[in-house]
Amino acid sequence: ADVVVIGSGAAGLPAAIKAADGGASVIVVETNYDVGGHAIISGGNVPLGGGTSAQKKYGIQDSPDTVFSDLTDWTIVQANGWPDFRYNDREVMRAFADHCALTYEFLLESGVQFKEVPPDNQGGHNLGNSAPRENHAFWTKGAGYESPNNRAGTGVIRPLENSARAKGVKFLL
């Protein structure tokens, strides 16, 4: 393989897909009996903003600069928020903010479906988001392999797995 990806969770699967898109032969190595990591048993809440197509559809104003400000500006912290993340590296936060909307579109292109509801601020702790950014993955019971706890995280992981396999990515479980 040209590329070996360690782990098949919410970071590993997209890495494998992008490498395959670039023409590389890819193998994903996973220590578990199934793909998905912690993401497959998550609630399927995906906090991406910065002007996603979902935000635009529902008239929500957001931008990469606003995402960056929300992640680095201490004056925005809400009373019950977790301020610790504002210690994160500013360059990493800038890169995250600049790629949020592109990441959302990548998930859609990879087959991830989100509930037809406006993004909101549920599914987490009030971190001081000035715009609704929480998207909720959709998964229909019986539509394929599900997580052991039937959580919506499968609505993110299974489409990513299917996309990777369709692009020739091999898995070593």
Residue ranges and their predicted role:
Residues 1-11, 27:
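Beta1/beta-strand and adjacent pyrophosphate-binding region of the FAD-binding site
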Residues 16, 20:
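Gly/Ala-rich phosphate-binding loop of Rossmann-like dinucleotide-binding domains
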Residues 41-73:
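N-terminal glycine-rich dinucleotide-binding loop that anchors FAD/FMN and/or NAD(P) in oxidoreductases
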Residues 92-173:
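Conserved redox-cofactor binding core of oxidoreductases
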Residues 31-34, 46, 51, 119:
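Short, ordered loop/turn segments at secondary-structure junctions
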Residues 9, 22, 164-167:
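Extracytoplasmic low-complexity repetitive segments enriched in small/polar residues
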Residues 21-42:
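Glycine-rich FAD pyrophosphate-binding loop
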Residues 56-57, 78-95, 145-147:
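Second-shell loop/turn segments in exported
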